[in-house]
């Protein structure tokens, strides 16, 4: 039983950090890429671009505050043992764990995008597909796993939320003063699916041979493939009647709409050596319609006795009900997007060839908020090349976890790629048959973003004086005209 639990935790520690994301901190100070407009709409690339499906960009991210290999390994006699070794006390193990576990995942895929300049104005428009999930949970489960003794553990007050939606956007960026650039982006949202719930009771009874539990709570679901006309109050969820697969119904059910805005600004000081910026992104909501809304209560029991190593089958039984409210009585509801706040500052030297940046990034989820602080060194050695090396602090991110991003922006191609959490410290994981894989030790998060756009037009410098005259220059011109 203990070996099985060790295996499960090792898998969770790795799976929990693999993700794709929509807010990539390392690229924030990279001047050439069109991708960073997602982080601050005041930013503008040097050229216009066209981004095509799949190639345009994919960004995936998972964040958590408890799943890392380091939280489950301990140094003993010059080597490493797992948290389930007899030499590791429960107190020592639980000291590494937060009071509540927080887990989130975001994924964005650019379906189509276009950006172009009209004089001093930069415009961009396009279409994105988005998926976001977040959950907040009790850490009592790790007490049960470590102690492996008789006891009842309270996992209540657990909540989760998931959204899938499309957004069609149009944005602009303009330099309104010699040292100030502002930007805004408006998004029309179309909801694809929403699922959420919370457990007000989730109790687990653990002994060395079996895990039993009871659960109760509330849940809701909404989506273009849901039809609640056959739902009756107090009945079990009739999945075969609620879930529609005919394309005619699905296309006619695109009735979950919303609106969101990105707002940003950047100011330059000390003759453009210091740049300070701030932005709010995904400030908006989706209104989910009544016709495609179902919800109700969760009530059930379960037991788990482990995994059969020979057959790879999980030995578990469960008995639960998803009771629903009457479809005619359900109401539409509104869900908020995961809004983000970015505040950055960069000081550059050597004619903007090297910059030192600091970025505060906070995401507000439905069940929690998540903040990080990223320091970076940004290199711009050529007019068509930039690179960044970064380190993210807060949320117990350890030294030795770095980010890296690269951007090539020639007259025909705009290519970018990067990762925010690259763990340089690896350890040997538990033996699995004849294999003993290496695992990243400290990382709780890992993201990757990559994309290719096709550039067009002449290069623009968003920090040059082109198109914006200083007050002094304007006064000088008026004086000349008066003479």
Language-model region placement:
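Bacterial Sec-dependent N-terminal signal peptides
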Residues: 1-25, 345, 483
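Subset of outer-membrane beta-barrel
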Residues: 23-483
């Amino acid at each position: 039983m203990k070996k099985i639990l060790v295996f499960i935790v090792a898998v969770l520690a790795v799976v929990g950090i693999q993700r794709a994301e929509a807010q990539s901190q390392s690229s924030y100070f990279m001047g050439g890429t069109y991708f960073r407009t997602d982080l601050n709409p005041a930013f503008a690339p040097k050229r216009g671009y066209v981004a095509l499906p799949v190639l345009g960009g994919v960004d995936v991210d998972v964040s958590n505050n408890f799943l890392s290999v380091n939280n489950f390994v301990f140094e003993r006699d010059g080597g490493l043992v797992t948290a389930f070794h007899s030499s590791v006390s429960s107190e020592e193990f639980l000291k590494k764990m937060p009071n509540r576990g927080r887990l989130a995942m975001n994924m964005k895929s650019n379906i189509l995008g276009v950006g172009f300049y009209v004089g001093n104005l930069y415009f961009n428009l396009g279409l994105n597909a988005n998926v976001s999930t977040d959950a907040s949970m009790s850490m009592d489960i790790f007490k049960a796993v470590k102690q492996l003794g008789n006891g009842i553990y309270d996992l209540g007050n657990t909540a989760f939320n998931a959204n899938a939606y499309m957004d069609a956007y149009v944005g602009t960026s303009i330099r309104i003063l010699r040292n100030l650039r502002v930007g805004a982006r408006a998004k029309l949202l179309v909801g694809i699916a929403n699922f959420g719930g919370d457990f007000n009771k989730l109790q687990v009874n653990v002994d060395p041979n079996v895990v039993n539990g009871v659960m109760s709570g509330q849940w809701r679901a909404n989506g273009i493939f849901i039809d609640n006309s056959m739902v009756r109050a107090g009945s079990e969820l009739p999945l075969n009647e609620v879930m529609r697969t005919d394309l005619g119904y699905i296309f006619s059910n695109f009735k979950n709409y919303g609106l969101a805005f990105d707002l940003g600004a950047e100011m330059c000081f000390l003759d453009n050596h210091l740049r300070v910026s701030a932005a709010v992104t995904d400030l908006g909501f989706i209104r989910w319609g009544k016709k495609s809304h179902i919800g109700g209560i969760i009530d059930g029991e379960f037991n788990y006795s482990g995994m059969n190593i020979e057959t790879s089958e999980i030995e578990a039984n469960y008995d639960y009900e998803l009771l629903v409210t009457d479809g005619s009585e359900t109401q539409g509801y509104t869900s908020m997007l995961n809004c983000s706040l970015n505040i950055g500052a960069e000081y550059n030297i050597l004619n903007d060839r090297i910059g030192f940046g600091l970025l505060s990034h906070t995401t507000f989820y439905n069940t929690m908020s998540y903040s990080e602080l990223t320091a970076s060194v940004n290199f711009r050695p050529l007019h068509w090349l930039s690179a960044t090396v970064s380190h993210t602090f807060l949320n117990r991110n350890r030294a030795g976890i770095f980010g890296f991003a690269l951007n090539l922006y020639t007259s025909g191609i705009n290519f970018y790629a990067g990762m925010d959490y690259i763990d340089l410290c690896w350890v040997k994981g538990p033996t699995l048959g004849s294999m003993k894989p290496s695992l990243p030790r400290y990382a709780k998060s890992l993201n990757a973003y990559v994309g290719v756009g096709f550039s067009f037009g002449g290069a623009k410098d968003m920090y040059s004086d082109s198109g914006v005259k200083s007050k002094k220059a304007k006064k000088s011109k008026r004086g000349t005209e008066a003479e």
